Swiss-Prot record:
Membrane topology category: Multi-pass membrane protein
GO cellular component: ERMES complex; SAM complex
Designated name of the protein: Mitochondrial distribution and morphology protein 10
The gene coding this protein: MDM10
Assembly: Component of the ER-mitochondria encounter structure (ERMES) or MDM complex, composed of MMM1, MDM10, MDM12 and MDM34. Associates with the mitochondrial outer membrane sorting assembly machinery SAM(core) complex.
Length: 467
């Protein structure tokens, strides 16, 4: 589950009209959310608040084995008035990353005004308001010692360019040693057709570059053709993207290189019926280390997703296989509250099987139960699906397993006014030399079961309350 300030930061990206999907860093976002999720390892409590549309705070306390905490503050120049901040109102799908349905490439819109409205709507406003650049400031102080301070500065320089400054400073472990600090500077450029990212880190003077290219129509040229642009986006059913990244450090002589491909369906970008389930395929290569990884993610239904990954190294002949899934569920109480909306949907011929009819090529609507409503226009399927599903889920279950039988299970949901995340990790654990020697003396190596045993690795619970 995302932290509260991470959720606010995503809301800032949406309010400032920045497309975070059009980046090489987000190439495998869906597979990572379904396969590489983390589980809590101890008890953790988070208290957060969006006190004003511009200011948010978070206080964190962790216990069981090690007591630590953090204090975080966030400020943004873009008002987040329409962003739910209470833990009872935040859509759970906004906090739990899952199958990421990206949108078709488009030209970045104008910057929002100081009151949060789109720039193209404020025609009669002054130029000073139109040129207001969205800015975000975020700082976190981690306690107890060694104290660490982290910060983030985001600023939109133009509709297509964003500047990011991130720093980390740790207190020295000994009085005579110098404190450790690092600054990472990123300049991101997004035109819709392609995106680029330039990076510099003061840690070993690391330079980096990332780029992503989308095959297909160019949104910059289509934007000048009016209706032709909308017709082209409506007919775009899938998207193929290719990208690469490179790093170099003259201080430590470190070189890094990787490249990747992504193919994904775009059901949200078209009004034409789809005859396949939404899915995403990725292929990433790291030539210097000889690593190759492929992922396949599938949205089997609005509430069920599957993902798998296969990795292989041509130098060591080592392989990796991981599979995972997520299942969204609803409580019986919310089903009773939604009876009225379901009856209204039935009058229009829209029910929970609409998505399945589209896959089979059948009409989107079921037979109407009220002939008086036959002449009314049915609601659009995409609006019905996207507006209903984010608020209709109360909990989610995630499970992943690899070839070594390392299993992670995670449950995240809403309990009263709290957002709770509970997880467990199982897998082979190394035996101590003493227990292995005693087992070998009694029954030999076979009786001991080898150098490892299967058992619990971690169990934890995280609780979030926000206002």
């Amino acid at each position: 589950m995302l932290g509260f300030l991470d959720y606010i930061q995503l809301a800032f990206s949406d309010a400032s009209k920045w497309n975070r999907d059009n980046s090489y860093s987000q190439l495998t976002t869906t597979a990572n959310a379904l396969l590489d999720f983390s589980t809590p390892e101890r008890l953790k409590v988070n208290l957060s608040s969006l006190s004003t549309p511009h200011f948010a705070t978070t206080y964190t306390l962790g216990t069981v084995g090690l007591i630590d905490g953090s204090i975080s503050y966030l400020f943004t120049t873009v008002p987040l008035r329409d962003t739910p901040s209470r833990s009872t109102l935040i859509p759970l799908r906004k906090l739990v990353p899952g199958y990421r349905q990206i949108s078709a490439p488009s030209l970045p819109p104008e910057l929002p005004t100081v009151d949060g409205r789109d720039g193209d709507l404020a025609i009669g406003e002054t130029q000073g308001i139109l040129k207001k650049k969205p800015t975000l400031l975020h700082a976190t102080l981690h306690l107890p010692p060694p104290t660490t301070l982290t910060g983030l500065f985001l600023r939109r320089l133009s509709p297509t360019t964003q500047l990011s400054l991130a720093f980390c400073s740790s207190r020295a472990s000994t009085p005579k040693s110098a404190p450790q600090a690092a600054l990472v500077t990123q300049i991101l450029h997004d035109t819709g057709k392609y995106s680029s990212e330039f990076l510099f880190s003061t840690d070993n003077a690391l330079f980096g570059f990332k780029g992503l290219w989308n095959f297909g129509p160019d949104p910059r040229k289509q934007n000048q053709q009016g209706d032709l642009a909308r017709d082209s986006r409506r007919s775009l059913l899938s998207l193929l993207s290719a990208g690469a990244e490179a790093y170099y450090s003259p201080v430590s002589s470190v070189v890094g290189l990787s490249t990747g491909l992504r193919f994904t369906t775009l059901p949200a970008a078209t009004e034409s019926p789809h005859f396949t389930f939404p899915y995403t395929l990725t292929l990433t290569l790291t030539p210097l280390t000889g690593s190759m990884s492929t992922t396949y993610s599938l949205l089997a239904s609005p509430n069920v997703s599957f993902s798998s990954r296969f990795g292989f190294n041509v130098y060591s002949w080592e392989s990796e296989m991981v599979a995972g899934c997520e299942l969204w569920r609803r409580s019986s109480n919310n089903r009773l509250h939604d009876d009225k909306s379901q009856r209204d949907s039935a009058l229009f011929g829209v029910d929970d099987l609409t998505w399945a009819r589209r896959k089979m090529g059948l009409p989107d609507t079921a037979p109407s139960r009220n002939r008086e409503c036959d002449d009314l226009p049915p609601p659009r399927y995409d609006n019905y699906y996207h507006q209903r599903s984010p608020h209709a889920s109360d909990s989610v279950i995630k499970v992943r397993v690899d070839q070594s039988w390392n299993i992670r299970a995670l449950w995240e949901g809403r309990v009263k006014e709290l957002l709770v995340s509970a997880g467990v990790a199982l897998g082979p654990t190394p035996r101590s030399s003493l227990s292995y020697a005693s087992s070998s003396a009694v029954g030999g190596v076979g009786a001991a079961g080898g150098l490892s045993s299967y058992g619990w690795k971690s169990v934890g619970v995280s609780v979030l309350y926000s206002s």
